[in-house]
Amino acid sequence: MLEDTREWVPEQGTPQGAVISPLLSNIYLDPLDHLMTGRGFEMVRYADDFVGLCRSPQEAAEALAVVRDWTEKASLILHPEKTRLVDARIEGFDFLGYHFERGRRWPRKKSMDKLKDSIRAKTGRTVGKGLPMVIAHINPILRGWFGYFKHSYRPTFRIVDGWIRRRLRSILRRQRKLDGIAKLHGADHVRWPNAFFTKHGLFSLQGARDAVSQSP
């Protein structure tokens, strides 16, 4: 590298999350892309995360050997826990926030947990806040999450929608008790059906997914 026209050799890599890190990864790993393509392997890469897609265990082992040889010569170290051979028809694998398995994809567990943590953070202190305000706080989170995971396996969105509505019903029940309202009778999902939250503007992941599927 050059600094003030003087050459120097950095002893550490760029900080994780730095704006320039993906660019440097693309520049440095571009030869690996061409090598794998030239050898007939299919590889998908984003910055320094990549997966090789192979038709047999033998081909996968050969592809991994090529990658190991190249990275060693390039003075790079493969992540010991992330570097492995898997059968996507049985075990599946995580990549860029998704879990891929049997030709389908859905948010990996860590991505689901992160979304739920964000919703909990926005709905943890709701005293004095009406439902419209709570929904206004969580809708941007849901829209952003959907924007990235909208191509997930469809049942995923129904499951997450259900979890969010149960969370909101719990809040409504708690608020009624704090307001001194008499004991509630009947199931929460009957008292506050799905249409109730739709009427109050709650962003529906399932509804958004259906709209994407129907668009030309």
Placement of each model-derived feature along the sequence:
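Non-catalytic terminal/accessory segments
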Residues: M1-P216
